[in-house]
């Protein structure tokens, strides 16, 4: 068997003929030519037999490694004039538009990025992280289910931080599938407006319920004409409990600042170490943390009252209570919090009273962001695993290829290219 024939079978790329093979010190260079007589625009479906000029464009792509050798595919491409996109270098069937990697290589990297950290990927495939990010963006652009916004009846909208410094992504999930179906940079009304704009009025009107946090931005967007005006707004109990936890943290900080002014600085340091004992659920406490809580209870004061309020609010949603029971307990909590004299909890009570209907709707319909929050926890793991991103688009792409509706097909799982 000739070397060119062997490499043709090993490459398993469609629409090419191998014309030359060059074994170099650290890589194998395979020169190919396209078999098709028609030139295809890389941006659209337009094709033509006519060349724009006789100039050839030398191009190369990184392919899957051949053992320890890098494998590079080279070809001289032709140029065409597309009526829509103007003069372009012809597209190739084995690589995505604008890429210097073959589709097989990118599909492998895209799958690896869902399971491995940055350092491991760089070592295995021998490309820098910025290149990995751009590969993932291309995999997302071509691999996401094009019908992911169809039959979207119950969804959740939430924001997640992708980088320190108030850098956020808004993510929309389908509660029925447990997958992210849309995402964009930002967390304001205009960001969610973009989602409804892409969804269109007809599909937006089909949404029956949408869960979100208790901020005003997402609700304002959902209630705009042409958006989800008929959907029931459900304020997620997770965020209600989170509001109580954040209020407790504000009280703790205030008390800690007061203790720092005392002559005994050791007391302030010991008190600062009580943070996790206060924030964790009672069932998750260590023995030392339980002992810390007992000391705080004996001491009493604002901090213990704040902790008791936080736990009272958490307990309302810890069980499977009916809507009327939750409503009664929320009213009781709000009354207690309003009389507490603790400003952060007074604010929480005001917010709950204002959002009461949406909170109870979430309980009544069983619609909440619990599954979405589970996705958000996985998002944070993804972000930590990647050690940062060069752009919001890169972060969003990795999130979507990992947690979105995409079917990863590895090169060996794809149907083999038939020999000519």
Model-derived regions: residue spans:
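Tryptophan-centered motif/residue detector
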Residues: 58-61, 93-97, 129, 182, ...
């Amino acid at each position: 068997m000739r070397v060119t024939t062997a490499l043709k079978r090993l490459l398993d790329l469609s629409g090419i003929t191998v014309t030359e093979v060059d074994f170099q010190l650290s890589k194998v260079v395979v020169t190919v030519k396209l078999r098709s007589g028609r030139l295809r625009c890389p941006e659209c479906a337009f094709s033509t037999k006519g060349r724009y000029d006789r100039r050839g464009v030398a191009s190369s792509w990184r392919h899957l490694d051949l053992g320890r050798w890098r494998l590079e595919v080279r070809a001289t491409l032709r140029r065409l004039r597309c009526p829509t996109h103007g003069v372009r270098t012809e597209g190739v069937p084995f690589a995505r538009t604008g890429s210097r990697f073959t589709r097989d290589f990118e599909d492998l990297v895209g799958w690896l990025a869902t399971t491995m950290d940055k350092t491991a990927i760089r070592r295995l495939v021998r490309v820098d992280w910025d290149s990995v990010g751009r590969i993932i963006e291309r995999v997302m652009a071509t691999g996401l289910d094009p019908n992911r916004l169809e039959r979207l009846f119950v969804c959740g909208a939430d924001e997640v931080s992708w980088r320190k410094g108030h850098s956020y992504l808004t993510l929309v999930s389908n509660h029925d599938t447990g997958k992210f179906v849309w995402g964009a940079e930002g967390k304001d009304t205009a960001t969610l407006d973009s989602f409804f704009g892409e969804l269109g009025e007809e599909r937006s009107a089909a949404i029956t319920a949408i869960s979100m946090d208790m901020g005003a931005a997402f609700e304002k967007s959902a209630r705009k004409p042409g958006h989800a005006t008929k959907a029931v707004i459900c304020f997620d109990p997770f965020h209600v409990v989170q509001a109580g936890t954040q209020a407790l943290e504000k009280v703790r900080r205030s008390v800690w600042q007061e203790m720092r002014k005392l002559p005994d600085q050791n007391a302030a340091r010991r008190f600062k170490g009580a943070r996790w004992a206060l924030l964790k659920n009672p069932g998750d406490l260590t023995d030392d943390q339980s002992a810390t809580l007992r000391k705080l209870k004996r001491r009493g004061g604002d901090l213990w009252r704040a902790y008791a309020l936080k736990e009272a609010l958490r307990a309302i949603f810890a069980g499977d209570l009916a809507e009327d029971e939750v409503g009664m307990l929320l009213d009781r909590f709000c009354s207690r919090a309003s009389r507490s004299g603790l400003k952060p909890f007074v604010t929480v009570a005001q917010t709950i009273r204002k959002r009461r209907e949406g909170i109870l709707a979430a309980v009544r319909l069983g619609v909440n962001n619990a599954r979405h929050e589970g996705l958000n926890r996985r998002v944070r793991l993804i972000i930590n695993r990647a050690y940062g991103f060069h752009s919001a688009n890169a972060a969003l792409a990795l999130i979507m290829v990992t947690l979105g509706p995409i079917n990863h097909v590895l090169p060996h799982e794809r149907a083999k290219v038939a020999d000519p």
